[in-house]
């Protein structure tokens, strides 16, 4: 076979392989096969030195033309493959705007935050302002100023978290009322939400829970005002047909004192404590009990959430179980 025929045969073989190359890797392998250091065309060029001088120019021309033809085929196929690979990449990136979006988890407020916000809004709408205070208190603010003597069980270390002899974690938010009365002149109407701490843990009690207490001080305040605020609070929270009842009780900082039950979902729930501010509390903050009268009430926000949403175990509110939390 003459070298022209051999070159023609090589070109036909190369054309067939190159035009059928499907990706850049295959095409690069073919470039090495034909034009690499040990490639077919390179091997032909090495034969040049063994030819007679008169044949060398013709042979060299044939081999160079073969090389140029193969390079052209490779470049053309590379362009086609590059374009094809771009199109495939675009297809992978393309998104059909008419398809429904991917469902993503959406965060929301914790149920206790929702209930607290709702409670604050209710009392703000009735003219109360929201006041907060420190969670670490002295016994005077937490007990003495609230007419709770040293012999009272609530002051026992088994019931309260003492940091040292002079400080403890507050057992209620009532100290906020004392601080407010010491810094403001009456009349006043406040609610004080916040975390409180007691040594108690079971299905209905937590060692740390959130409480909201209310205080209203003015001239001629009576139990009728207390009953009005509590009835209005219950109706706005749980519905217009919600009923309440007051039962006589005892708290050292109120006189008279009442436990308050709310009738909801065909049963009575014990929800909060309340009463008329004890004269000794007014004396401790410099208010004249002959001139001013006050009412007070307090409840656990967790308890309100349990009643409103039918939650059986208070501990579910702090376990951070997503299966529970996503229900609210």
From Swiss-Prot:
UniProt xrefs under Pfam families: Phe_tRNA-synt_N, tRNA-synt_2d
Record bears the keyword Metal-binding: yes
EC number(s) from the headed UniProt entry: 6.1.1.20
PROSITE patterns named among the record's database cross-references: AA_TRNA_LIGASE_II (PS50862)
Disulphide linkage map: none
Subcellular location: Cytoplasm
Any GO molecular function: tRNA binding
Record-stated family: Belongs to the class-II aminoacyl-tRNA synthetase family. Phe-tRNA synthetase alpha subunit type 1 subfamily.
Descriptive protein name: Phenylalanine--tRNA ligase alpha subunit
Species, as recorded: Fervidobacterium nodosum (strain ATCC 35602 / DSM 5306 / Rt17-B1)
Designated gene of the protein: pheS
């Amino acid at each position: 076979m003459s070298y022209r025929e051999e070159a023609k045969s090589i070109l036909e073989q190369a054309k067939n392989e190159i035009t059928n190359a499907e990706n850049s890797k295959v095409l690069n392998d073919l470039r090495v096969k034909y034009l690499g250091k040990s490639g077919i065309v390179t091997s032909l060029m090495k034969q040049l030195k063994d030819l007679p001088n008169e044949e060398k120019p013709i042979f060299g021309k044939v081999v160079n033309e073969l090389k140029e033809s193969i390079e052209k085929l490779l470049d053309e196929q590379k362009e086609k493959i590059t374009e094809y690979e771009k199109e495939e990449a675009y297809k992978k990136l393309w998104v059909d705007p008419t398809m429904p979006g991917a469902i993503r988890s959406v965060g929301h407020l914790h149920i206790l935050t929702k209930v607290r916000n709702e409670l604050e809004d209710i009392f703000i709408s009735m003219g109360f302002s929201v006041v907060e205070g420190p969670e670490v208190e002295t016994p005077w603010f937490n007990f003495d100023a609230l007419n709770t003597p040293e012999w009272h069980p609530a002051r026992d270390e088994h019931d309260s978290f003492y940091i040292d002899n002079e400080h403890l974690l507050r057992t209620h938010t009532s100290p906020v009322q004392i601080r407010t009365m010491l810094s403001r002149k009456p009349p006043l109407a406040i609610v004080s939400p916040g975390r409180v701490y007691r040594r108690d843990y079971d299905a209905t009690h937590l060692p740390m829970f959130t409480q909201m207490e209310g205080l209203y001080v003015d001239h001629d305040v009576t139990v009728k005002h207390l009953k009005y605020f509590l009835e209005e609070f219950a109706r706005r929270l749980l519905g217009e047909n919600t009923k309440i009842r007051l039962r006589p009780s005892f708290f050292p900082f109120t006189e008279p004192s009442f436990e308050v039950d709310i009738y909801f979902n065909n049963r009575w729930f014990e929800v909060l404590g309340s009463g008329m501010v004890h004269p000794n509390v007014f004396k401790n903050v410099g208010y004249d009990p002959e001139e001013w009268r006050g009412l007070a009430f307090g409840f656990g926000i967790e308890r309100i959430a349990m009643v409103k949403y039918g939650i059986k175990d208070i501990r579910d509110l702090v376990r951070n179980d997503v299966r529970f939390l996503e229900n609210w």
